[in-house]
Structures are given as C-alpha cells and as structure tokens.
Amino acid sequence: MEDRLQNRIFRGDEPAWANACVGNNGSPGIIDYAEGFADAAMVLLDQVLAHRFSYSTDTFIYPICFNMRHAAELYLKAAIQLLHSLGGRSRGLPPFDMDGSHDIGRIWAYFRDHAPSIDRRYQSVVDGLDDSIGDIAAVDPNGQVFRYPFGRENNKHLEEIEVINCRLLKERFAEIRAKLSELGRLSAELAYEYSLGTYTAHLSRLDVFCIAGMLPPRAEWGTAAFDEAKARIRNLFAISSNEFSRAVCLVKGNREMATLIASPIPLDHCDSEQFFAFFDAWFGLNDREEVFGWLTKDPNDMSRSPETETQDLLASIEGDAKARAEAWASVSKNLSLEAIGEIEALYTFYKTSNMYGEEFDRERVAITGHLTRKLQVGEANYGDSVMNFMEKLPVMQGVLDALNFFGHNELVRLLLDRYQLSNHAARLLEDSNWRVENRVARIQEHLRVWGGGELSGRVPV
C-alpha cells in the first residue's frame, strides 16, 4: 500500500459527502481547477449580493477578484496546452513556460497571436475575449494585486481604481466565463479532430471538408468544372497547387468526404450479399411483426415494452435456442469475422453518435480485435458474442443510418426493398438524413464566414 500524507487539517472525515476527491483520487486537470476558482468567485458574489451588508464588499472583493483572475489564467493555460497538441500544425509554435508564467497579458498575447494561425476557428473566440482579458491584465497582470495590499516595491495596489461594483463584476465575469468555457470546448474539439490526422500544412479538417463540398462530382473531374472549382478553392484558401492536390487526396480517401463528391468508398469486407446474409439471419432472430411494431411506436421510446420482454422470455424458454442455432449456422457459413465486425462497427458508429466519419474505421478495428479474441477463447464464445449483437432490435436502423451517412444509397435501397421496409424509410433514416443536411449547412456557414465560397451545387443531401 502506498504511503499517504497524514495531516490534521487536509484529510477525510465524516460526513462522506463533504469529502473532496483530489490528487490521483479523481485526477482533476487544469480545467477542473479553473472551474473551481470560477465557481468560488460566483458563489462569493452571490452571497455578498443576496445578503446586503452581511458580508463586507470591502473585504470579500479580494478573494472574489483573485478567484476570477486565477480562473481566467488557468482557462487560458489549458487552451495553450491543447494548442500544442494539434498534431503537425502545432510543431512550429515557440515554447511556452506553462509553470513559470503568471503574467496574464503575456499568456493571452501568446494564445491570441498564435492560435488563429493554427486554426481559423479560434479567431472569433479570440475577438470575443480580447478586451476582457486586457481589462484583467491592466489591473492585475501577475496575480498579486488582489492577494496583497502592497507590491514588491512597497507600492500600494489599486490606488487608481477606488471602487469595484460587485453587481457589475458578476455580470461581466459571467460573460467572460461563458467565453472562456466556449474556448475550452473549441480547444477540446479541435484537439480530438486533429488527432484524426485529416489535415494539411495550412488546411484544417473542416477546410478540407469544405473543399469536398466545393468540388464537382468525381465523374466530372478532368473537365472544365473541376478546373474552375480548383481555381476558386485555391483563391479562397490561399493554397498552392500541391496543397490543393493533398487536400483532394484526403477527400478521396475519407469515407465521409467522399460522399460529397458522389464517390462513396466501398466497405472492405461487405457487399450486398453479406448484408443480405446477415439480415436474413437477423430477421430469423427478431420477429418481423415486432420489428414493424417498434418502427411505428414513439420514436423517443427505443426500448421494448414489458409485454414484449415477457414474450421474449417465454419464446427463449420454448424455442429461441433453436432460432439462435439456425441463425449462427447461417452467419458462420456466409460471413467472415471481418464482415461481421464491419457490420457491427456500422451499428456502433451510429449508435454512439460519433461526429467524424474516421471514427468508423477505429470502431471496426476495435470490434474486429474483440471478436478475434473471443474466437481465440473458443467458437462458442465467439458465437455468443455475435448472437448477442444480432438480437438487438435497433441494429437494422443503426446499420441503415450509417450506410446512408456514408453515401451507400443503392445498398440502402436494396435492403429496404428486400425486407419490405420502404414505407418506413423516413423513420429509419431520419437521423442520418438530418446529419447529412446538417453537414452541408456547416460547410455553407464556414464558407460564408471565411470568404464567400460556394458549394458545387450538386452536394448530395
């Protein structure tokens, strides 16, 4: 057992709910610290304002402002940490002394001057925070003003201010905190997005995505339409011909972006025959009437009814083992482990509402590895894992949504026709249709903000 610090002050006690988890017990990060200081400032402000004259504004103002300022410093340092994690785009950044620097003006200047050059999406957040951080830096640049009445040169702090209004302070800090939280969300989103590897020296994934939307369909490449699109794209994003070519290669090789040029990437292990074999067996495990009943009930209720659960239990006692055996015999004969893993990855990709198409390939690798380990234990173990997946009622919808999202429209049509689900297409594809429309809207907004580019006019919706 590891040694732990024994202390009469900083230790756990009763009641248990009053114990705070610190250190490795919860592993708080810099954002957790920032949130704590920000919350403390707001709680103190609330108490001072709610209990007029009970808590002296003249004394509470110091911990309030110190907590506010320190929260802002930590939020900015967290953003700089993430800025340095943006793959190859961050390699040219100058070093930053995260521990030694407490000058919030310097901290902000570093982020403000470098972040938009890494990714243009930072610009609007920088613009929204610049004046506010400047105000903080003008009063307390190094975090000393609200901690001590005098500075190192024995100069009295805050002589030029005299009065700070707590009501106004609360309003302004709420605004600043909201913008800092927005910065935190954007930084975390970009850190994950860049981890996918879909970017070039000067283009983010979103830029490449917009380029995909501006290109004509793949069948028209080599025509005047492609040359015109290339000229518009190079002008809008200020990129060389070589970088344009790199962006085009990313578009062609990205499952999600390839749909925008009407050239969906085939699945590695499944064609229509594999899907037919899978769903023929799936309908052997899931009663057709139950499937249709599930499709026609409240879309917000994705669970089976208690009555259905009871029927399923009785059916399993009376003969479900036989149905599982028949389904497994068919699936194991007609589908490879990799094909099953690919189908399950389509379902899992959509079930977890992943934002990026690249995550499907990550899911496929993970699920195929999991199934391989099950098979290494024994075929029965592998078969149970596959059957447990196949018995899930939402599998059909999840797979269809994923196929629709990746532009496999003909395959979706074949599956709907084969299983007499065409009348339920709107319900089955509602979510993926919304996401397809939303990604087009996102491209349009990005192009509107950053230079007035336009879509090819033939982007699949």
For the regions a protein language model found, what residue spans apply to each?
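Domain-scale activation on soluble regions of proteins
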Residues: 1-461
